[in-house]
C-alpha cells in the first residue's frame, strides 16, 4: 500500500483553492500508485481552529467543497485524509474528513457518537484498513499514543504544533537525526508517517520536512524542509527497505530554522498595504 503526504501551502480561507489543490494532489499521487493521500492539518483551520468553527457557513462551505472533491476523485479509488475542525456536542473538535467512494465522513466525531460514553475509550484513535494495512490517525503524540489500539500497522501523525525554536520536534525530519520519533516506531513495531505542514497560518509558521519511518525506526522517505513536496512511500510490514543514513538527514540548527521560518512568514503574510481582516471575521457568530 502506497501512502502519499502532500506537503502543500495554501492561503487560509480559500476553500475553493484548497479543494482544487487537494484534487490535483490526489491525481498526482494516484499516478504514482498511492492509495491514501494525507494533507496538512492547518489547511482548513489554521493554527487556531476554534474560531473557524464559529464562523457562519464555514463548516457548510468546507463540507460542500470537499464533497465535490470526493465525487470527482471517486474514479481514482483513493482515500483522502483531510484534517478539519468541526462542531461536536457544542464544542470545536479536531477531526479529520475521510474522502472515500464519493463521500465525506468526519471520522473521529462519527466513531465517537457510535462509542457513546464520554471516556478515554471514546476518543481512542479510529483505525481503518487499506489493502491490509491498518492505519491510525493521530494529532497529539503525548495523549493519543497511550490510547492506540493493538494491531495498528501505520501511525499517520498530523503535526499541528507550529515551529518552536525550543522544541526541535516541531522541525519534523530535522529532529529525527537526534533521536526524535524513532522510538515511537521501533518500540511499537509500527510504521510512522509524519505529515508536516509548510508555510504561515494565522500567527504561526510551519517548516515542512514530512517523513516516513519503517517499523524499525529507520527513515525510508523524507520531504524537503521549507518548501512544497509530494512524498509517496510504499508501506510494507516485515520488509526491509533501503533507508537513509543519519548523515543524509537534515540537522536542526536553530538559527537556520529561525531564518527560514521568517522567510516563510514574510512570503505568506500580506503586506500592510494589502492586509485585510480574515474573511470569516465579518461573518462570525456572536
Language model segments and positions:
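A phosphate-binding catalytic loop at a beta-strand-loop-alpha-helix junction
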Residues: 262-264, 268-286
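Conserved hydrophobic/aromatic positions in well-ordered beta-strands
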Residues: 4, 97-99, 211, 231-233
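Flexible inter-domain linker/hinge segments
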Residues: 132, 137, 242-265
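CN hydrolase (nitrilase-like) catalytic-core segments centered on the catalytic cysteine
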Residues: 59-81, 143-229
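N-terminal glycine-/serine-/threonine-rich phosphate-binding loop
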Residues: 1-36, 264
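Active-site catalytic loop in hydrolytic enzyme cores
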Residues: 64, 88-158, 163-179, 226, ...
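Active-site beta-strand/loop signature of hydrolases that rely on acidic residues for catalysis
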Residues: 18, 28-55, 80-81, 152-160, ...
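Non-catalytic positions within long, well-ordered alpha-helices that form the structural scaffold/packing
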Residues: 27-30, 148-149, 271
